[in-house]
């Protein structure tokens, strides 16, 4: 079931060169360890560049957004079977 969330979250990420790689995030008091990054893409909205990550743990899929202008992470969607 797909659930639109659109909530700010805290993310632990690795930064290598010009690339951010989310490792885990905190949502609703739970720490979710990212097991796989399924898809990444970026787009500009005005002068801000947004990075999107489709990630999964062992059971769920999530869509994360990173705003490079204000360094804010957002959980956009969650999907669970």
Spans of features found by a protein language model:
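Cysteine-centric segments in proteins
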Residues: 1-81
């Amino acid at each position: 079931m797909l659930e639109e969330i659109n909530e700010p979250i805290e993310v632990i990420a690795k930064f290598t060169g010009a690339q951010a790689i989310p490792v885990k995030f905190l949502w609703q008091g739970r720490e979710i360890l990212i097991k796989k990054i399924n898809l990444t893409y970026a787009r500009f909205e005005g002068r801000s560049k947004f990075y999107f990550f489709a990630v999964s743990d062992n059971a769920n899929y999530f869509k994360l957004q990173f705003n490079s202008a204000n360094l804010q992470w957002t959980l956009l969607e969650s999907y669970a079977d």
